[in-house]
Amino acid sequence: EISECLVGSEMCIRDRNQIHFFGLDWIQSIGVKFIFKLDNISMILTALTSFVFLLASFASKFNIRTNHKFYYSMLMLLMSAILGIFTAGDMFVFFLFWELELIPAYFLIGGKWGVNENPMAQSSAIKFVLFTFLGSMVMLLGILLLHYYNFISNGILSAVFSDINSSSIPDYIQNLISICLLIGFGVKLPIIPLHTWLPDAHTNAPTPVSMILAGILLKTGAYGIYRFNYQTLEDAFITIAPILAVFALVNIIYTAFVAYAQTDIKRIVAYSSISNMGLVLLGLCAINQIGLSASVFHMVAHALVTCGLFMIAGIVYLRCKNRDINTLSGIAVVMPRLFGFAVVIVLASIGIPAFAPFISEILTMIGALNADFSDVLK
């Protein structure tokens, strides 16, 4: 059954030409169209988004006690922004939704929701917004350069992804654009050293928001790299991929050791998420079908496992008023059902065979080992 699922997912990803779209002209003078498209990868991620927000809404019942109308309106606005990112068919529409998500994310991370309010939550929210906004400005520069040079080189005044032909843009300009975009997406993924906002935001946010941050928000960075760098600026990405793969390995190894040194459950999961997103990035850097399939598969597997881990951390905190693993001995006696659930989720998170993360990690390694960087490294 697992092999059938893998073949099915690979065929789904391979067939990228089946795109359904709808939209309208927005700013005709510069070729911007308010257009939405669904290919197979964005379809997977939109379905994943809906499911994670469903889980977060369920968890909110136990973690949110005040300002319900405002909280759920921000939750739905954030969901709409993320779905807009995954379905945008135009670069500027993508950027519009990329910036729109900052507003609800700020209030959700830093808001006062009546249960176990964290005094550090607001400062964590500000840090998240500053990091993301500064990265977005660099990303916007890359989008503007891509839009301009696509017009200069091809005579096409359009910001629609399918109208961009980067092969006629000079190589050094492609590389510059690709780096600008990677900085913006690298904040959200995150790529070390642009990761310092994440542990604080994950730790200090309410449990449902932590589930969304790790389960979906990080995937917007990986999707941006796929949509812009991997798919649109393919030649530049082939050049940059070997260097980016080194950053991916640093993500995987360094943050795994940092996670090992933590005692707060949510902080452990936060650093573990950075390590797992390094695997996603490594799969993309392989630039082959196995790596791409593994990358998407691992995004889904990591989202589900991480939501489970944060849900466990939230339940433990609601019951024990504590997340320090050094003081939680004997919890299996007090909460045996939760303990059983936690054992399964933790085994999945560390990649035990037969669980989804194990399969995606093995496929990522196979994709990376089959990567051909010989032409680039000559």
Predicted regions and their residues:
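Structural signature of hydrophobic alpha-helical transmembrane segments
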Residues: 38-49, 92-104, 174-185, 235-249, ...
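Transmembrane helix-loop-helix hairpins at membrane boundaries of multipass inner-membrane proteins
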Residues: 9-73, 153-162
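Positively charged, low-complexity/disordered segments
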Residues: 1-8
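Central hydrophobic cores of alpha-helical transmembrane segments in multi-pass inner-membrane proteins
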Residues: 9-10, 46-61, 78-79, 102-112, ...
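C-terminal ends of transmembrane helices
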Residues: 53-65, 107-120, 189-203, 252-270
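Juxtamembrane/interfacial segments at transmembrane-helix boundaries in multi-pass membrane proteins
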Residues: 15-33, 120-125, 136-195, 200, ...
